[in-house]
Regions:
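Short basic helix-loop element that most often maps to the first helix and adjoining turn
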Residues: 5-24
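Helix-turn-helix DNA-binding elements, focusing on the entry/boundary residues of the two helices
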Residues: 7, 18, 29, 44-47
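Recognition helix of helix-turn-helix/homeodomain-like DNA-binding domains
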Residues: 26-41
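Conserved hydrophobic/aromatic packing and binding residues within compact polymer-binding modules
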Residues: 7, 21-22, 32-35, 61
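DNA major-groove recognition helix of helix-turn-helix/homeodomain DNA-binding modules
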Residues: 26, 45-60
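DNA major-groove recognition helix of helix-turn-helix
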Residues: 25, 36, 54, 65
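Short, charged recognition helix plus adjacent turn
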Residues: 60-75
Length: 75
């Protein structure tokens, strides 16, 4: 899953508007919308803010993992 789809799904699953999430990353609603639609790139500092806000790992957010939280090591 690509990160834009994950962004939208996380926002919708938490019953949030684009404007509400845009405030978290200090963007306008339009700026946030452009990221979700693929017309602008998500900056790394905004990725970190969103991961902290949603309490998910960056691997999950960008689609590397299907697990929202870091898996414990089997050591």
């Amino acid at each position: 899953m690509d990160y834009r789809t994950r962004m939208r799904n996380l926002r919708e699953d938490n019953d949030l508007t684009q404007k509400q999430v845009a405030i978290i990353i200090n963007k306008s609603q339009q700026g946030y919308s452009h990221i979700e639609e693929g017309r602008a790139e998500l900056k790394i500092d905004d990725l970190i803010k969103l991961c902290k806000f949603y309490n998910v790992s960056s691997d999950y957010f960008i689609g590397i993992s299907e697990y929202p939280h870091t898996e414990p090591s089997n050591k």
